[in-house]
Amino acid sequence: MKKILVPCDFSDSAVQAFKFAAEIARGNNGEVILLNVVEIPVVHDSVMMPALTYEETYLKEMKDRADRDFAKMKSKWAKDGPKVTTQVQYGATTPTISRFVEENKISLVVMGTKGASGLKEFFVGSNTEKIVRWCPVPVISIKNATKASSIKNIVFPSTLHKDEEELTMKIKALQDFFKATLHILYINTPANFRTDVVNRKMLNEFAKRFMLKNFTLNVYNDLSEEAGVANFTKEIKGDMIAMATHGRKGLSHLMSGSIAEDVVNHIECPIWTWKTN
């Protein structure tokens, strides 16, 4: 997590993401890059206002405004470090951020979620959701003001499949960075019910295979995997959820927006996600 990208539209949620990212970077001598993407408006030529002149004026105004806002953020939230660089780029938000991640060898993206629906928006249709779907590096989604130093309990919903090796190693590194307890979680549902004897055996084998330390093993019964993750996290007062997205198995369909609104809106903690194949 040495090179952290924070896409920034200067909203409160973007500021919270920046503060979280800056704290991480201070802890490992890393760097934060603030990126503001300016959407280019479509303007037709006219006698009164040539398109090129309007576009140049608009882009200059947007860049000047972004530079001023960047300076305020750095002065207020990163006066004592870490290293913060800023970029203003032009184009459609998602492809521009995607290209930036690939070209600049970003290791982590930290994004704010926004809107009254909170994590509902994160899962359905927002820029955050779009970026989570394609991003080749981990993404941490921040809903509210959160101190990185407060992350002490990480919930890892797992299918316990053998093909989760790369994911699990990344989450172990995440746990090590935060010096947190890792709560391995298997959700037992009526549609895919397994006995406690079977589940406990699989959990113990999983922990042994990956040589886990400072962890708990948990089976949680609920009507759906989505509800189970949300309810378990609330019950143990989890500080972060870490999970895969967009895979063909397991919990990938968490991104489909099927979590009941009255459950997901009460999840306040950050979510770490990584796109698997």
Regions found by a protein language model. Name each.
Residues 68, 72-109, 210-241, 247-255, ...:
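Structural beta-alpha unit
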Residues 1-53, 153-219, 234, 238-240, ...:
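Small/aliphatic-rich secondary-structure junction motif
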Residues 111-130, 243-266:
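Glycine-rich, Arg-bearing micro-motifs that act as flexible, cationic patches
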Residues 42, 94-96, 118, 149, ...:
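Generic structural signal for helix capping and beta-alpha/helix-loop junctions
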Residues 1, 105-107, 128, 137, ...:
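Local beta-strand N-terminus motif with an aromatic residue
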Residues 111-113, 138-144, 271-275:
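Short beta-strand elements of ligand-binding domains
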Residues 37, 114, 144-146, 187, ...:
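Short, ordered loop/turn segments at secondary-structure junctions
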